[in-house]
């Protein structure tokens, strides 16, 4: 990756904004927008410990009998090289690479990785194993949703303990002496490459957080979900609305949006219906400007800084262009999000629909409480009489979910509230 591309990506994750301001750019880039005061976030969380910056080609060893590794100076997220891992294409023969450590305390931390996948569809899973000389280890899902690596460019992936896949034996997390990265090929796949550019630990948050969000601005947000949440003692949520859908049958009106914000404390945020990956840069900008103009004109400057990707789809152009319009982009990729998020432009979620069960909610909330991650529950419609669509959640079921959230005792915050309170994790040099 050329130096200017690396710097662009680094500035991206640090919130750097390089384009000239316009009436629809982020409030901090213009003097005409007046966002309400935000609480001052704490100092950025520094890495607890850098485990490997990939600059020593001898530090990592191939521990599996399959696949191969080599230092690669043609692409890197940091320094002058990365570690290239080539898979076998056989799901029964994963490729594992090991890093020996002198003994690192990982009892209370999160993990910070920079990864690049040649083709994410060729990979079933990427697992991080933390252990010692034997086979005892904590096994984590680095990317529970492999779409996180869809762009083929360098991605920052932060991992919370809530992404635990298995505990083998009795690993000593107070003295980890071996880190293993295991890449499992997808079934019927071809050999493919994965690059590892950086690995570190990060401090854990003081508390887990739950957010409730709704996509598309359906009037069930106002008529059904809001009342259920209030009855459960949950104050507010985030509604991601589409400008040209507001006021249509089945969608919230401008008056209802105003009441949701001014009376009930909800945040009204940005969404769209067009697949942005089908557009050129001018088209992407038009979509962003349309929804930001609508939200700013109707008095929602804080929500206007947060965008939910239509159908969860994005590419490098969408990510790059979004920097000048938003503070966060929300995906539909299912994974526990770290606090603070490592990449605010790829926020991961707990995507909920008619298929979601109470046991899944219970498990997600228990892990959120124990491991202090961000559990961001995303819904579409909450219906008294569901129509069978996967995005339609029965009101009785939603009520049980909200009672589970309330009973957990976890703080519930809107997306702008979470993002205001969390300083971005600095991108390592």
Per-region residue spans from a language model:
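Metal-dependent polysaccharide deacetylase catalytic core of the NodB/CE4 family, i.e.
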Residues: 208-210, 230-319, 324-327, 333-336, ...
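Conserved, mostly hydrophobic/aromatic
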Residues: 215, 229
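Extracellular beta-strand ligand-recognition surfaces/modules
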Residues: 111-113, 156-192
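Extracellular ligand-binding interfaces
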Residues: 89-99, 103-167
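C-terminal domain-boundary segment and adjacent tail
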Residues: 42-46, 188-206, 231-232, 241, ...
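Short carbohydrate-recognition loop motifs
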Residues: 72-92
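N-terminal secretory signal peptides
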Residues: 1-7, 18-25, 32-34
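Extracellular carbohydrate-recognition regions
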Residues: 38-66
